[in-house]
Amino acid sequence: MANKVIQLQKIFQSSTKPLWWRHPRSALYLYPFYAIFAVAVVTPLLYIPNAIRGIKAKKA
């Protein structure tokens, strides 16, 4: 496996993007993370109206 420190150092130091977006494969990791994070944040918010009205989830 070749040592790519110099190439990566040039990429990271010459880029004006935020640090977490500088790597060439960062979109591969960040877009799925953002999607899962959005679902994890929004899903509990969908249950708030039922919680306010006192409606419990149906048991299967």
From Swiss-Prot:
Pfam families assigned to the protein according to its UniProt record, in alphabetical order: COX7a
GO BP terms in the entry: cellular respiration; mitochondrial electron transport, cytochrome c to oxygen; proton transmembrane transport
A single cellular component GO annotation: respiratory chain complex IV
GO molecular function, one term: oxidoreductase activity
Residue intervals on the Mitochondrial matrix side: 2-29
Subcellular location: Mitochondrion inner membrane
Main location as per UniProt: mitochondrion
Membrane topology: Single-pass membrane protein
Pathway participation: Energy metabolism; oxidative phosphorylation
Mitochondrial intermembrane face residues: 54-60
Domain of life: Eukaryota
Protein keywords: Membrane, Mitochondrion, Mitochondrion inner membrane, Oxidoreductase, Transmembrane, Transmembrane helix
InterPro entries reported in the protein's UniProt record: Cox7_yeast, COX7a
Chain ranges passing through the membrane: 30-53
Note, other: Present with 639 molecules/cell in log phase SD medium.
Described purpose of this protein according to its UniProt entry: Component of the cytochrome c oxidase, the last enzyme in the mitochondrial electron transport chain which drives oxidative phosphorylation. The respiratory chain contains 3 multisubunit complexes succinate dehydrogenase (complex II, CII), ubiquinol-cytochrome c oxidoreductase (cytochrome b-c1 complex, complex III, CIII) and cytochrome c oxidase (complex IV, CIV), that cooperate to transfer electrons derived from NADH and succinate to molecular oxygen, creating an electrochemical gradient over the inner membrane that drives transmembrane transport and the ATP synthase.
Family as reported in the entry's similarity comment: Belongs to the cytochrome c oxidase VIIa family.
Oligomer and partners: Component of the cytochrome c oxidase (complex IV, CIV), a multisubunit enzyme composed of 12 subunits. The complex is composed of a catalytic core of 3 subunits COX1, COX2 and COX3, encoded in the mitochondrial DNA, and 9 supernumerary subunits COX4, COX5A (or COX5B), COX6, COX7, COX8, COX9, COX12, COX13 and COX26, which are encoded in the nuclear genome.
The protein's name: Cytochrome c oxidase subunit 7, mitochondrial
High-level lineage: Eukaryota, Fungi, Dikarya, Ascomycota, Saccharomycotina
